[in-house]
Amino acid sequence: MPVLHNRISNDELKARMLAESEPRTTISFYKYFTIVSPQQTRDALYQMFTALGIFGRVYLAHEGINAQISVPQSKVETFRQQLYAFDPALDGLRLNIALEDDGKSFWVLRMKVRDRIVADGIDDPSFDASNVGAYLKAAEVNAMLDDPDAIFIDMRNHYEYEVGHFENALEIPADTFREQLPKAVEMLREHADKKIVMYCTGGIRCEKASAWMKHNGFNKVWHIEGGIIEYARRAREQGLPVRFIGKNFVFDERMGERISDEVIAHCHQCGALCDSHTNCKNAGCHLLFIQCPLCASKFNGCCSEQCCEELALPEDEQRRRRAGREKGNKIFNKSRGRLNSKLGIPDPTE
């Protein structure tokens, strides 16, 4: 029986990946379709991906698959063919190719079975996730942006919206997708007669959100095909104006793809124009925040003087201090409340 999980340390795997001479391509894809046995599907895909030297993050559930991966360039076409042949539901699936990319986005393959490929909190048995809004292609997106009857809804997190979004897009102020869904319905109820255009990074969240809006009585609902990634790619290929402003946050080592030259965010420590996310260098904090080069030098990559001081302690003392602290998901919590609390930022929603 082959080993179907990684047994090598992250540091060693990262060093191996960085030492590779072959270029890589970052690809994301998703598909809502019925998977009868997610665990068996996961194991088969793990072996296939491993044989091709693929790294990345893949989630499977009975409702489908969601993946962000790094593929050796020489194996991209083989990967495409094998994926399309793996299940009829995946044949011809759109693959989103990263815009700004050296392929060094992942260095380990993590493949997990979950209850949902996107945590939505929906437990309404009458909800039909397949009854989605109509797709919009790049030219249609630009036309909708000029339509006074259309409202663009950003279905991403606050830290994604902060560094980039479509012109005049509405942010849904919530910390998770599951919190955004009911809030979007509530916020847009008075605009039920408008054209609702939903978008996210690669399409997976806005597709489900569009179905949820239709389930709640909204009839004029669209979503951007392939999300921001596909929109920007197609707009550039077709010589269209790219109407997304700033940077597209991505969930890998890059933390962002530059879409336009505008920088619309600010360093969370000094307020200078900056849209570069980082994680606090103190392993006991790991806060996701925006930090300019000057503050990165001043605070040694940390979010605060306290974390900077803790990082300077001997490793044993750092581990002792971390013992008993909040662990797991709490340490990696990206909520607006935790960010504001750690950095003393006024909450814009209050």
UniProtKB/Swiss-Prot annotation:
GO MF term (any one): oxidoreductase activity, acting on paired donors, with incorporation or reduction of molecular oxygen
EC top class named in words: oxidoreductase
Classification lineage: Bacteria, Pseudomonadati, Pseudomonadota, Gammaproteobacteria, Enterobacterales
Keyword Flavoprotein attributed: no
Ranges for region Disordered: 318-350
HAMAP family from the UniProt entry: TrhO
Family: Belongs to the TrhO family.
Keyword field: Oxidoreductase, tRNA processing
Record-annotated Rhodanese domain positions: 146-240
Domain of life: Bacteria
SUPFAM superfamilies: Rhodanese/Cell cycle control phosphatase (SSF52821)
InterPro entries assigned: Rhodanese-like_dom, Rhodanese-like_dom_sf, Rhodanese_C, TrhO, TRHO_N
Listed name of the protein: tRNA uridine(34) hydroxylase
Positions of the catalytic residues: C200 (cysteine persulfide intermediate)
Role: Catalyzes oxygen-dependent 5-hydroxyuridine (ho5U) modification at position 34 in tRNAs.
